[in-house]
From Swiss-Prot:
The lineage of its organism: Eukaryota, Viridiplantae, Streptophyta, Embryophyta, Tracheophyta. Coiled coil: none annotated. The gene is Nict1. One of its GO terms (cellular component) is cytoplasm. It comes from the Eukaryota. It comes from Nicotiana tabacum (Common tobacco). Ca(2+) 2 binds at residues 54, 56, 58, 65. This is Polcalcin Nic t 1.
Length: 84
């Protein structure tokens, strides 16, 4: 089954909003800054999210890692897309 083009566009837009410096990956600082814009988040919560999303353990969330998470959590991504 082909993916919905809107889902792909939403993922790309959301990733770019988190990738503040445009280097193609999301650092824990970028993740924390963007989440704080959405509401209160603790540094522990940011670290927990990084650990969950950074599956290769390099300290960054690549687009591929983000895409894998987004595909597994479509409902959450649709909610986030409404905010962004």
């Amino acid at each position: 089954m082909a993916e919905d083009p809107q889902d792909i566009a939403d993922r790309e837009r959301i990733f770019k909003r988190f990738d503040l410096n445009g280097d193609g990956k999301i650092s824990s600082a970028e993740l924390g800054e963007t989440l704080k814009m959405l509401g209160s988040v603790t540094s522990e919560e940011v670290q927990h999210m990084m650990a969950e999303l950074d599956t290769d353990g390099d300290g960054f969330i690549s687009y591929e890692e983000f895409e894998e998470f987004a595909r597994a959590n479509r409902g959450l991504i649709k909610d986030v897309a409404k905010v962004f």
